[in-house]
A protein has these predicted regions:
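Transmembrane alpha-helical hairpins and terminal membrane-anchor modules
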Residues: 138-145
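Transmembrane helix interruption/hinge and helix-loop junction motifs
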Residues: 127-132
Length: 178
């Protein structure tokens, strides 16, 4: 597993002050206020856009390089179903929760390398839409604790999705420095 994939998967869920529901298909909250503010703004920006329009916005508004955006989209497009990840209950019941934790991961000290690591990790998660992935990447990348060792946790709840299908839905996400 690449260091980039491991980094993004190392976000750990912690207590959250608020929750944000969005049309991008994901409801998350961060313990870090800066990340939460960036997520709220990015989710508004990406709502209703095509994947191509989101890619353009990531480059022109959020300062990602074209190669970072290409990497994000290719990893997102090739991601596995959440049910293929080890650790998730094999026979869950409705309402059951699972905290997927990866880490500890030491972030690179330079911003670009850390951003690429987060892109790989978050894009590989079973997040319901490219817009939601892009919003998460944008929110986290702007507030990375460079050079720190972190644990990332994503809490999932099993139940009916917005499409009326039973599945795991990502919820609270947090980055904890260890």
């Amino acid at each position: 597993m690449s260091a980039l994939l491991v980094l993004s998967m190392s976000v750990n869920s912690v207590a959250y002050a608020s929750s944000v529901s969005s049309p991008t298909g994901i409801e998350v909250s961060f313990s870090n206020a800066g990340i939460q503010e960036n997520l709220d703004a990015a989710m508004q920006d990406f709502t209703g856009l095509s994947d191509k329009e989101i890619c353009d916005l990531l480059v022109h508004k959020y300062g990602f390089s074209q190669s970072e955006v290409d990497l994000l989209y290719s990893v997102y497009s090739a991601r596995a179903s959440i049910s293929t990840y080890s650790g998730f209950p094999s026979n869950p019941s409705i309402g059951q929760t699972y905290g997927w934790e990866v880490g500890p991961i030491t972030l690179p000290t330079e911003q670009d390398a850390a951003r690429i690591a987060v892109i790989n990790a978050v894009a590989a998660l079973a997040v319901p839409s490219f817009g939601a992935v892009a919003a998460l990447i944008t929110a986290i990348a702007a507030n990375l604790p460079l050079g720190e060792t972190v644990v990332i946790t994503i809490n999932y709840t099993y139940g009916y999705t917005n499409d009326g299908v039973l599945g795991w839905t990502p919820g609270y996400i947090g980055i904890r420095i260890v």
